[in-house]
Amino acid sequence: MSRRNFKVLYISGEVSPFVRTSALADFMASFPQALEEEGFEARIMMPKYGAINDRKFRLHDVLRLSDIEVPLKEKTDLLNVKVTALPSSKIQTYFLYNEKYFKRNGLFTDTPVQGELKALAEKVAFFNVGVLETLQRLGWRPDIIHCHDWYASLVPLLLKTVYRDHEFFRGIKTAMTIHNVYRQGVLPFKVLKKLLPDEVCSELHRSGDDVNMLYTGVEHADMLTTTSPSYAEEITGEAGNAFGLSEVLGERNMTLHGIVNGIDTRQWNPSTDKLIKKRYAPERMEGKTENKRALLEEIKLSPDTDRPVVGVIINFDEFQGAGLIAGSLKKLAAMDIQLVICGSGDQKYEKQFREFADAHPETVSLHTDCPDSFIHLAIAGFDILLMPGKIESCGMLQMFAMSYGTIPVAFAGGGIVETIDDYSEKDGYGFIFHDYTPKALVARLGAAVALYHDSERWKEIVGRAMARDFGWKHSAEEYGGLYRELLES
C-alpha cells in the first residue's frame, strides 16, 4: 500500500477554532494538516457542543448522515452529523450531534459538578459508539483510527469486541495519544454497564465501583504516543509520574512513543497574522510594540509600554499551575511588571485572581473568556509568557510565544525542556526554573525582567527565539513512519 492511500481518522473532544480548553485543541487544529502534507488522507470527528456556532464555522447538515442509530445496551439513540472543513484546509471535520447529550455548552470533563457523572458516562458511551456507527454510514474506511485522550478511549476496545467481526472494520488499527495523563475519565461502572455490552464491560479497567477510561484505552490501543520523549520517560520511569498508570504504561513501553508537538506556522506567524493589530517580523519589530499598546488599551491597563507585560494562559487547576501563581501573587505584585492572567476553571482560583486584579487595577488584568482573536493579540502583546504548569506533556503556547518574540519563563516539566533552551549570555531563548516553588518562579521571572531592561541583550534573545523553526514537518515525518510500521505489523 502506498502511503498516499493511507487514511487516518482523528477523534478528539476539542478542536480549535471550534472549541478550545487546552493545548489538545491547538494540536488537533494543525497536526492532521501536517499529516496530509506527508501524503495521508485525514479526517476528524468530534462532538457538536451547543457552544459551537454553526454559522460562524459554516457547519452544514449531511442528509445521508441523519438519524444514525447508536445501539447502546438498553436503548438505541439517534445522532445527526454536521460537517465543515478545518479552517485553512480541506480536512473534513464531522460533528456528531444529539440534543440530549450535546445541546448544553459543557464539554467533556473528568471533574464534573456533583451529580453529573451519570450524564458524563452516557455522553462518552454515546459518542464512542456513535463514531463507529457514523463511519459505517459514511462509507469512509480509515486504515487507522487515532484517538486523543480519554474521551475517545472506548474506540479501541469496541473494535476488539462488539465490532470485531464486522467486515467494514476488519484490519483497522488504533493509535492513542496521551496529552494529559492526569485527566483519566473516572466514571461509574454501574452506569456504563447499562450502556455497553457485557463483552465490553468485562474488559473495562475497574477500580472498585469506577472505571478508568484512559487506562482502558491504553490497554487496548495498538499504538501509544505522547507529546514529547521527556514526558514519555516521566510517565513510565521509576518516579511513576502517571497518576496510577505507571504500571500499564511501563508494560506497554515498547509501543509508547514520545514525539514533540509542532505548530501551524501559517496560522501562528506574526508577519501574516490577521488577528493582531500590526504584523511584524524580526527585522521590523516596531509592530510588536504596537500590539503591546493595543493589548494594554483593550484590557484597560496602564499604557506604559516600557514595563514588561507578563502573561499567564492556563486552566485554573493545580496541574496547570494555578496554585503556584496564587502562592506567588504578593511577590508578583512587588515586581515592576504588568500581569495578565487568562483562563478559567476552579472557582477558588478565579475568585483569588479576581480579587488580586481588583486590588491592582493599574497593573493586573484577569480574563476568563479568551477567544482565539484575544489569544493571538495577547501572544503578540506580551513580552514574557509565564508557564507555571507542574505537568506539561509538551505544550504549544511556548512555541507560539517564541515565534512572536515573546520569551517564556517555564517550569522544567515534560516537553518544556525539549522546546526551550535556558538562557545564557551566548545562547538560549527562554528561562526555566527547576524547583516548583513561588521563590524559584519569581527568581527566574526576575532574571527575565532584568534582561528585558537591557535592550541590546533582550533584542538578542528575542531574535534567537524568533529564529527557531517550530513547524510540524519533522514530527509529522516521525508519525508517518510510526503509522506505516503499525499498518505493517
Swiss-Prot record:
CDD domains: GT5_Glycogen_synthase_DULL1-like (cd03791). SUPFAM superfamilies: UDP-Glycosyltransferase/glycogen phosphorylase. Keywords: Glycogen biosynthesis, Glycosyltransferase, Transferase. ADP-alpha-D-glucose binds at R20. One of its GO terms (molecular function) is alpha-1,4-glucan glucosyltransferase (UDP-glucose donor) activity. The lineage of its organism: Bacteria, Pseudomonadati, Chlorobiota, Chlorobiia, Chlorobiales. This is Glycogen synthase. Pathway: Glycan biosynthesis; glycogen biosynthesis. Its EC number is 2.4.1.21. It is an enzyme of class 2 (transferase). It catalyses: [(1->4)-alpha-D-glucosyl](n) + ADP-alpha-D-glucose = [(1->4)-alpha-D-glucosyl](n+1) + ADP + H(+). Belongs to the glycosyltransferase 1 family. Bacterial/plant glycogen synthase subfamily. One of its GO terms (biological process) is glycogen biosynthetic process. Synthesizes alpha-1,4-glucan chains using ADP-glucose.
